[in-house]
Amino acid sequence: MNIKGLHTQEKPVSATSLFKSELGNATAIQILQGGKLKEHITKTPALLICVEGEVVFENENGLKEKLLPGDYVNIEPMVKHWVVGTIESQLILIK
């Protein structure tokens, strides 16, 4: 199995459940070049990991991080944030 195979449509942003449990879940996210995961908040702490590609993560507190394969960012609860794909990218979000 490969994470790329989880996204069958060429949408700018695609998300699909990778793993669910009572204690948390993991979501596979694909962002195409120029695609943007719109501004939103999370109610719980989260971890975003870049598996492939390059994205820019930003939040309303002024944090701006370029994520390359192997890079990650901790996402604070109740803080608006968004992600833009510099090139086609594969990410994993753990909550």
Task: For the regions a language model picked out, list residue spans one by one.
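Conserved short histidine dyad/triad with adjacent acidic residue
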Residues: 12, 25-42
